[in-house]
């Protein structure tokens, strides 16, 4: 397979191959969000939560439909390893975002426009009983004009890879398909064909070495220390606070009054005449935790660890940050906002957790992942790879993250020239893999790489293992 070269930073995709001429779609499914859009564009047009609602035997997609209702359950089609667990739900979710959201004019045949759309905005699990093949052809093969590039985790299984091309070719009728690993695409988005990609996402953190546009398989490292893990650390911190901090999700608050910092909330809570499903409550609590992460949590920049004597006392004298809960209660956070993220770097600093998911070992910390990844790389390649460290993923947007990473790398590899490439824009850091896919799929030189329908018909789903390395 020929190696895929990224664009230089001075060349835009549309300069090489007009974006409006390309009907290729790029789909980047993740544990927290699913991103989709057209190749050649700078950002995904659609970003939907990978969490979806399930009520009365039907699935509903889109954040606007995740609202409190009797029996309303929140599910995710992926597991915490960022691998698809429920293929039926994944297929429906992807089709919803690729057709209904991206190309609404093609999502329903003219004969049925406006007829079968429910007020829940859902995609029913069953068809509506119309067996007229001609009338439903547009629904059966909704992507017959769109080549599709899909992203995958570097540890994705061969079975899952074959399932992805099967759905794309058989169910959606795509004319061409490609499957690309997220670290390769994140490197391409940064203009690199060789890099060490550190992806700190919602469900996990991975470190992968890329050489000439190919994943070095022995380098692949991952750990559950990502955004969801950080949320569990915040919950531990709140539980141990004086006074204890209770998470009251926004949907439960009817009205509130301003109160002093540390004072009890004065809020009227909504009363529901049905039980709220625990999965819905957890999903809504995660929204509050995400706000706290984005506005309060910070990474200790170094050069020493946060636990080094004197550091915590020094932070206590600095201005803190106030966070207001949805119920109006608020509190000033100083040293705690650094301590809560320190377990990502130093396992001894993590809040103790009784559940296995919340625990962190030394091998799961970011420095240990980097060390293990580079040990899987030929010694001669290491300097070049360390000179191109690409940081991506939403959790890498924590204040101070890049400074700390720089200090850790400098301590681990003294004398080696280290350069970190981290997009300054929030959207570019969150959508690194999607942007790389958009660049790749819009290249005129990439057209020879696509797996065509003819190749698929001749070789079956196994072609994806041979072609998409």
UniProtKB/Swiss-Prot annotation:
Subcellular localization(s) per the UniProt record:
Nucleus
A GO CC annotation recorded here is: NuA4 histone acetyltransferase complex
For the keyword Zinc, the answer is no
According to the UniProt entry, which residue ranges have a biased composition of type Acidic residues? 119-136
Q: Which InterPro entries match?
A: Actin, Actin_CS, ATPase_NBD
> Disordered: where is this region?
104-136
Name the source's superkingdom: Eukaryota
Q: Does the keyword Transcription regulation apply?
A: yes
Q: A single Pfam family, by name?
A: Actin
Q: Which GO terms describe its biological process?
A: chromatin remodeling; DNA repair; regulation of transcription by RNA polymerase II
State whether it acts alone or in a complex, and with which partners, per the record.
Answer: Component of the NuA4 histone acetyltransferase complex, of the INO80 chromatin remodeling complex, and of the SWR1 chromatin remodeling complex.
Known function: Chromatin interaction component of the NuA4 histone acetyltransferase complex which is involved in transcriptional activation of selected genes principally by acetylation of nucleosomal histone H4 and H2A. The NuA4 complex is also involved in DNA repair. Is required for NuA4 complex integrity. Component of the SWR1 complex which mediates the ATP-dependent exchange of histone H2A for the H2A variant H2A.Z leading to transcriptional regulation of selected genes by chromatin remodeling. Component of the INO80 complex which remodels chromatin by shifting nucleosomes and is involved in DNA repair.
Q: What is this protein called?
A: Actin-related protein 4
């Amino acid at each position: 397979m020929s190696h895929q070269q990224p664009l230089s930073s001075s060349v835009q995709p549309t300069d090489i191959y007009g974006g409006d001429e390309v009907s290729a779609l790029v789909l980047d499914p993740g544990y927290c969000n699913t991103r989709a859009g057209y190749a050649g564009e700078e950002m995904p047009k659609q970003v939907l939560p990978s969490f979806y609602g399930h009520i009365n035997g039907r699935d509903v997609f889109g954040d606007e439909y995740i609202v409190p209702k009797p029996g309303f359950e929140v599910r995710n089609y992926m597991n915490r390893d960022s691998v698809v667990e429920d293929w039926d739900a994944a297929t429906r979710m992807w089709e919803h975002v690729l057709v209904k959201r991206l190309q609404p004019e093609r999502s329903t045949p003219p004969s049925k426009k406006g007829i079968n759309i429910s007020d829940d905005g859902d995609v029913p699990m069953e068809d509506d009983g119309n067996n007229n093949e001609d009338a439903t052809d547009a629904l059966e093969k909704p992507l017959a004009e769109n080549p599709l590039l899909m992203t995958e985790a570097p540890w994705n299984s061969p079975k899952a890879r074959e399932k992805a091309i099967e759905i794309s070719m058989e169910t959606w009728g795509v004319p061409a398909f490609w499957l690309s690993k997220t670290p390769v695409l994140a490197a391409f988005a940064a203009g690199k064909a060789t890099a060490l990609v550190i992806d700190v996402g919602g469900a996990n953190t991975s470190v992968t070495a890329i050489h000439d546009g190919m994943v070095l398989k022995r380098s692949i490292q991952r750990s559950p220390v990502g955004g969801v893990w950080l949320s569990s650390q915040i919950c531990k911190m709140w539980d141990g606070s004086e006074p204890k901090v209770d998470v009251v999700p926004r949907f439960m608050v009817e009205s509130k009054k301003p109160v002093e910092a540390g004072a009890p909330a004065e809020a009227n809570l909504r009363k529901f005449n049905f039980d709220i499903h625990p999965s819905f409550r957890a999903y809504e609590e995660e929204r509050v935790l995400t706000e706290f992460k984005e506005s309060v949590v910070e990474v200790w920049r170094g050069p020493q660890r946060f636990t080094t004597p004197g550091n915590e006392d020094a932070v206590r004298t600095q201005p803190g940050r106030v966070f207001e809960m949805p119920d109006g209660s608020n509190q000033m956070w100083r040293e705690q906002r650094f301590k809560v993220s320190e377990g990502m770097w130093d396992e001894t600093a993590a809040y103790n957790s009784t559940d296995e998911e919340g625990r962190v070992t030394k091998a799961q910390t970011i420095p240990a992942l980097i060390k293990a990844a580079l040990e899987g790389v030929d010694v001669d390649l290491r300097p070049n790879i360390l000179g191109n460290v690409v940081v991506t993923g939403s959790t890498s947007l924590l204040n101070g993250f890049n400074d700390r990473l720089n200090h850790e790398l400098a301590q681990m590899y003294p004398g080696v020239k280290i350069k970190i490439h981290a997009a300054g824009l929030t959207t570019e850091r969150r959508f690194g893999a999607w942007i790389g896919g958009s660049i790749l799929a819009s290249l005129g030189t990439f057209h020879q790489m696509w797996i065509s329908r003819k190749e698929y018909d001749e070789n079956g789903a196994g072609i994806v293992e041979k072609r998409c390395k």
